Amino acid sequence: MASANSKESLNAFFNNELSFIQTTLNKINDSFDESSGVLTRKEDNTVKIEIIEPFKEIYFINNDGIEIHDLEFNQIKIINKTDLINNSMYNFINDGFSKEGLNIKEIDDSSFSIEENNNFFYFEFINEKVLHIKYKDNMNIDNLIKFYKK
């Protein structure tokens, strides 16, 4: 089992090709929405996130920001890094979990929380191949992402 409070364990986990399922609570119609995809970190530390369902999208993440390809509408959108300065998920994915002063609180042997930019993230290693992350996004929507090593 990966050590819950280990930044190295998180960074090592995210250096693998990962499949994921993201579940969000839609408070408008009181339902759960799901998306799924694959996250791959390349040797140059850029990240490709391919959303498979419900919409076909590809996100390219690097030090310059995020490039979003909507494959169904054949559109590309670019978000510059300066617009993502307080986006914790971007920071975690792009920079890893080695940021100086990252506020990690161990809960038990397999779970911990991180507070960054007044946002709280709950991490739980289910086992060495599965990691769950729970958080509220910038629109106060509850998110659960289940990552699986391939």
Where are the language model's segments positioned?
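Boundary at the C-terminal end of the N-terminal hydrophobic targeting segment
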Residues: 2-6
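A short, Trp-centered hydrophobic/proline-enriched beta-strand micro-motif
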Residues: 11-32
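Short, solvent-exposed coil/turn segments at beta-strand boundaries
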Residues: 14, 40-46, 61-65, 107-109, ...
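Residues that act as N-cap/strand-start positions at coil-to-secondary-structure junctions
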Residues: 31-35, 43, 53-55, 98, ...
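Short, surface-exposed charged micro-motifs
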Residues: 36-38, 56-58, 103, 120-124
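An acidic-aromatic
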Residues: 40-87, 138-143
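Flexible, surface-exposed loop/linker segments and immediately adjacent secondary-structure boundaries
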Residues: 73-112, 117
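Gly/Pro-enriched, hydrophobic low-complexity segments
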Residues: 105-150
